[in-house]
């Protein structure tokens, strides 16, 4: 079973979205696998072509239905936050650069050969739509 709830807000140069996803996976073990995720995303349009985006989210999967930590730790729970810069190159092309940090109370991430409780990434992408 899967369900979600979300909202979308937009006024002028500011927009926000938020959502909560939840799932229940039948398992052969005594408990069914329940997982959920929630996030909040805000965007501010500096110009028609340039915007900045911030995001916070939480993911909880104690029964490892969606995510199994590679570190061998039982269950997965993590928070994350990010800040991104978007540049609209053309009407249907977007460039994005984003810095993101993940936090957990368990050693679910790997850095080199070490198990750690947080992870930092910088990603970029090109989105093209038709």
Q: Could you describe each region identified by the protein language model?
A:
Residues 1-5, 36-40, 79-83, 120-124:
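Hydrophobic, lipid-facing positions within transmembrane beta-strands of outer-membrane proteins
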Residues 21-29, 60-68, 100-111:
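Sequence/structural signature of outer-membrane beta-barrel proteins
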Residues 5, 18-22, 40, 54-58, ...:
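Transmembrane beta-barrel strands of outer-membrane/channel proteins
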